[in-house]
Amino acid sequence: LEFTKPVQRLRECVDIVRGILKDSDVNYHGEIYDIDRFDLWFEPLRKEIPIYVAAVFPKMLEICGEISQGAILTWCTLDHAESAAWHVDIGARNAGRAPGDVEVASLLPCAVSDNREAAKDLMRQPIASYAGRFPRYRQLRVHAVF
């Protein structure tokens, strides 16, 4: 699949997952995805499972506030986390939801060592790898002075 229309793609993915969990037999015909007779082969433990969506940039964070139960941040500073939470709140309000109904969580990669330099060395490869694989996130890293 060509990765286009990320906002529409996210909306449809969340719709599809909710439909599968609720009914287990899904027909979905959207702008991005076209699914006929998807049948989940097992019964979910619950029909409603909170959906958290990973996002970094303002528009997608606002979409998280509109359609999910939580936004997952990654590799971010406290300043970015504060700004991200503000965008999630905007999205929640736009959808008529209370901002407090949408959680903001973060993946916090770290290295533990008795030696500070050794811990830094352990993080160099993951930081470089992430920056190399996800070019759009370089903008976030530069702004955060990583």
Predicted features by range, described:
Residues 3-40, 81-146:
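An alpha-helical appendage that flanks or caps ligand/catalytic pockets
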Residues 24, 47-51:
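Generic beta-strand structural signal
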Residues 63-72:
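Glycine-enriched alpha-helix->loop->beta-strand junction motifs that scaffold or abut catalytic
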Residues 21, 55, 75:
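Residues that line or immediately flank small-molecule/substrate-binding pockets and catalytic motifs
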Residues 76-80:
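Short, acidic/turn-prone active-site loops that include or flank metal/cofactor-
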Residues 59-61:
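Short, glycine/polar-rich helix-capping loops at beta-to-alpha or helix-loop-helix junctions
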Residues 42-46, 65:
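Solvent-exposed alpha-helices and their adjacent loops that cap or buttress functional pockets
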Residues 51-54, 71-73, 102-109:
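Hydrophobic faces of well-ordered beta-strands that scaffold small-molecule active sites
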